[in-house]
């Protein structure tokens, strides 16, 4: 038999949160930036491993793999783990607003907030002119069932914070369960 006691004092007050940012400087166009992002936070008693521990680990692993491979990206690759996504896209909204003057230099924002469900393709986020680009980009993974390109929007995650500033942003489509 185990007995215990926990005393908590809860309150509602502002807290400071941070985004975690790393980058690999581009070799030809270092002022042009491609952001690969995910969010660090989760809900208490929630499924933090899938939402969004998996996305955060993919971002970190992508940075590690690029560095270890010796690849030299032409554009700067910025890897961002956003805070406060579950509370209303707070970290990405603050980052996008702070960097609004640099929005024209941000070429794309790709966010991984997919959990463990299989990636099936990409929603164009109103950028139907990019359909062929995404068809070509996803062609190498078509055999995995991950190459569907569709008109439409994908909401509820950090790429949305950049769209009002004219920055193309996407989050992959996926199956609901892994």
Where are each of the predicted segments found?
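Metal-dependent peptidase/peptidase-like ectodomains
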Residues: 1, 29, 44, 82-177
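Soluble metallo-hydrolase cores and metallopeptidase-like ectodomains found primarily
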Residues: 1-48, 61-64, 68-69
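Short glycine-rich loop/turn motifs
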Residues: 17-21, 53, 107
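Beta-strand segments within the central parallel beta-sheet cores of soluble alpha/beta enzyme folds
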Residues: 34-37, 74-83, 108-110
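Alpha-helix N-cap/helix-initiation motif
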Residues: 45-55, 151
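Short amphipathic alpha-helical face segments that pack within enzyme cores
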Residues: 53-61, 90, 94
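A fold-wide structural signal in alpha/beta-hydrolase
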Residues: 59, 76-78, 168
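Short helix-loop-beta-strand segments that form the rim/entrance of peptidase-like active sites
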Residues: 65-90
């Amino acid at each position: 038999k185990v007995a215990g006691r926990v005393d908590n004092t809860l309150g509602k007050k502002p807290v400071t949160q941070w985004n975690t940012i790393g980058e690999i400087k581009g070799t030809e166009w270092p002022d042009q930036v491609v952001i690969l992002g995910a969010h660090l936070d989760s809900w208490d008693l929630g499924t933090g491993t899938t939402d969004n521990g998996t996305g955060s680990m993919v971002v970190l692993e992508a940075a590690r793999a690029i560095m270890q491979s010796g690849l030299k990206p032409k554009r700067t690759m910025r890897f961002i783990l956003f805070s406060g996504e579950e509370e209303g896209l707070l970290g990405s909204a603050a980052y996008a607003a702070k960097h609004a003057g640099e929005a024209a230099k941000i070429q794309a924002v790709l966010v991984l907030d997919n959990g463990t469900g299989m990636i099936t393709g990409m929603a164009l986020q109103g950028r139907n002119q990019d359909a062929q680009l995404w068809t070509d980009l996803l062609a190498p993974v078509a055999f995995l069932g991950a190459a569907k390109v569709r008109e439409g929007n994908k909401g509820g995650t950090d790429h949305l914070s950049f769209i009002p500033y004219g920055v193309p942003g996407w989050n992959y489509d996926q199956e609901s369960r892994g």
